[in-house]
């Protein structure tokens, strides 16, 4: 009988209709390399998802047995966490063939390790960005760091996706014989822009962008962490031809729109909301701008590199792993809008430099090809299993 492999991670809160849906499940890029590697080793695949009738669902990619994990993002919803714990315990009891639990994200990572060791399983934990990091608030640097150090004792294999986390994890004491690894995130499909074409002039006209505008694209939720405020504050100080298109929505949307108006740059800030044509928008832009305060290995930066854009990004974990300064773009302290404005102006005034940086990034991102990550995961699994 094949050994069982269980994959779990936090999930988003969804609508009742989505939760009760019987639509077949398709794996995402988040778990794709892991499921592929386990399948290559002949493991029987199990996966936790937040769907009421999970056990009845079929998977479009692999032969996976699902269960309703009831694991969400909130670290303060004790009732929900308790249900997630109980559901996981019941599932492990009902499937003694499971020998490996691969857990991800804060809540999934804690529950997976506690329950995994409770039932004598090999435990793999993949950290997609520790909540303690350089420049983090005191709570993160104390409570969250303590939790990770404590949970490391229940971890056979700890996988990180950036250099800062890799170095931090090496200072943890893992379960006997445990080991720390680093992989290149969850990978990107190098062919994802194949077949994507755009008439730049028409696309820009549809967005009411001036013909001579230097277009910076901003992608992400409009929340405190993504720090779009710093980008808007940089605009009055930057080259007047720079316009930004902001793809995303969130709780700070109205606040950011008011800020743009108060600073007199509302006509240069184009709030586009949720978009299904983000790849086309990358190709119609000149510069990628990202001011986030905390990331693991940001997918938006990786996609911008794939699109051949120069990247002006915050000097934080993840970004510094991806962007080589003065080769693929530039880095700035997350709250320093003066520095950001200067970097944007330099690129706005130098089209050839934009091309040079973008060309470099298209080559650099090849290290993060999903096929590379699949092989990294397979090598780790072969060691651990």
Locate each region found by the language model:
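N-terminal strand-loop element at the rim of the active site
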Residues: 7-80, 164-173, 179-180, 251
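A conserved mid-protein helix/loop that constitutes part of the nucleotide-sugar donor-binding site
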Residues: 21-33, 214-237, 251-258, 302, ...
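Donor nucleotide-sugar binding/catalytic pocket of nucleotide-sugar-dependent glycosyltransferases
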Residues: 67-68, 149, 153-199
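Short His-centered aromatic/hydrophobic patch
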Residues: 103-109, 127
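A short, well-ordered alpha-helix in the C-terminal region of glycosyltransferases
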Residues: 205, 339, 346, 353-367, ...
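Aromatic "clamp/platform" in nucleotide-sugar-dependent glycosyltransferases that forms part
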Residues: 274, 293
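Short hydrophobic beta-strand element within catalytic cores of glycosyltransferases
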Residues: 310-313, 323
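Conserved acidic donor-binding segment of nucleotide-sugar-dependent glycosyltransferases
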Residues: 325-326, 330-337, 346-351
